[in-house]
Amino acid sequence: MRRQPPFTAVALLVLVLPVAAADPPEAEQARAVAGQVLERTKAVLQSALRDGQPAAALRVCASVAQGIAREHEQQGWRVRRVSDRVRNPADTPDAYEREVLRTWQEEKSAGRLAPTTERQEIVTEGGQSALRYMRPILIAAPVCLQCHGEPAKLGPGVAEALRELYPGDQATGYSLGDLRGAISVRIPLGASR
């Protein structure tokens, strides 16, 4: 048996590893959807807040994110915002999402969590493979605190709107830079995986 020189083995690893580490196409789709949720929500919120309507922004924020989720439900995808301090009970994280949020909170506390952080992996749930993708939502600007800041400092009409729309709201008391939650995308994968 002929023995390969060590540099040949290293060269093969260098060529093979990038292919093995490449994202599945569903990961790029999930990344794009998460970006849509963040960008569309941000644009609509900025418009409502520019008009001096932080209480109206609460309704808009929910409707935009839910609209994007509905667009992808037909494909069997689940797209949602989750948090360990929910405003809408439908945004309560599942076990996978809770673990990612816990890990990110630790990273945030250590100063290692960036807005561009993401987590993706293929998991098996209920006998079916799925791509799980998450991207953090941070309290990135002072304007976020109009709806998510200290209760005594919320924007005009926000406390009243929260009591009406979300009587069990837990999503206040944040400070600038805090981890608010995450965009979570779950895409079922074909039987071939």
Pin down the residues of each PLM region:
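N-terminal secretory signal peptides that target proteins for export/translocation
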Residues: 1-4
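Short Cys/His-rich local motifs and their 1-3 flanking residues in nucleic-acid-associated proteins
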Residues: 149
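Short, cysteine/histidine-rich loop/knuckle motifs that typically chelate Zn2+
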Residues: 146
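Extracytoplasmic c-type cytochrome modules immediately beyond a signal peptide or single-pass transmembrane anchor
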Residues: 22-143, 152-193
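Composition- and surface-driven signal marking solvent-exposed, interaction-prone regions
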Residues: 6-9, 160
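Bacterial N-terminal signal peptides
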Residues: 8-18
